Amino acid sequence: MDPLPAALPGTAVRVLATTDLAAVLVPFRTSYGQGGSCAGVVDLLEAERERQPTVWLDAGDFTVGPAYPLLGTRPWADMGELPIDAAAAGNHEFDDGVPALLEATRVLPYPLLCANLDVGLPASAMVETGAGPLGVIGLTHPHVHRLSKAPPPADGWGGRVGPLARALRSQGARWVVAILHDGVDWWPDLDPNGPPTRARAERLADTARPWAGEVDLIVGGHVPDGWVGELAGTPVGHAHVFAASVLVIDLPSEGAARPVVRGWFPVPPTRPARRTPAVEALDAAATNVVGESRHTWLSLTGADRYLPDLIAEALREATGAGAGMVLAAQHLTQGTLDGVTAALRAGPVTELDLMWLFALADDRPATVELRPGEFATVVARHAATADPTARDADRVWWNWSRMPAGVSAGTADPDAVAVMPWVVPRLAELLDRDLATEPATTGARAALLRALT
């Protein structure tokens, strides 16, 4: 059986789209078995190119993930070897700052696009497909400056898309695609007879409304879930993160016909054809057993053993703080094919398992000082915001993963809470004040291992 459906009659070009590849150069363990890999996407692409013209578009975030802290350098060369045709810059592309990103792009043979940020990256590109030119516009995350070392997007950046699309069409583009590094708000579906996840697109629709009608297709990303829908009448979709799935779109040969998003499909767990330092580092970490878990822990709403709670307990005990708190969206190990965002499976725990949960060389948590009553306040406010039924919270920019926080408290009214440093701005927003923090002396990976024993 072919892993992807045959193209619809009248298809001129097929698009395969991915997001947040995160240097997944080798398959890794997930809650549902083996996850996909970059090499698996290449397998799908090569098979599709035997059947019809096919292009690969990506929504960015290439080198976030375990490979960077394991290797000590970002594996840009590995990602540059992938036969991608065009990509948008993700927020993690800016983690090391703009100069480092511009230097890194020198090894990429495909364009990394960013129309809504003035940093020296191209805004658009023309991709030759074998069936006519495809115009591509790249858009990074609208709040990239809050997520990385990037400047804010340009004022009124949505107004740039229309002129870019018209310019591409005037240059001969048969179709124009916008790649946006953002996705829907989603949450695990607790109905055993329903799909693994549910989603709403109000926040994404607000972002795309000024320009969605100017393009033929929107490819999204950034969030762990896969989704298909429409924005202002334009077909849109995004794959799951970490090469878990690929989004398939058929572009019609007839000019008046609309692109058809066929859906997302799992990526096979293919091993890379060539060993590189990054591949060797990932393989070594995957075979380096550092501990054992008696149970399977999942980041899944309602799970018997909720992984964010375990991490919160580990941070609290390691730091001596009165409490620990973990936002589920901040610790991703997989795409949500089964509704799970992170998993620590029963049995041997490897270095790679821990690196997926804390993919930084410096994994020290931070201790945040709290005033009386503030811990209960921040937990309650986060719960109200993350609640999937809270439609008035759909437009909170960081609220795309509607799952409960992991919480561990040693006292009724803790005077400090241990969190990972990147969570501090969210707590400050929820408490509406600046927060004083102190870095811990122990790392989160070591803390989690101790919590498992």
Residue ranges and their predicted role:
Residues 4, 8, 14, 23-27, ...:
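Catalytic centers of hydrolytic enzymes
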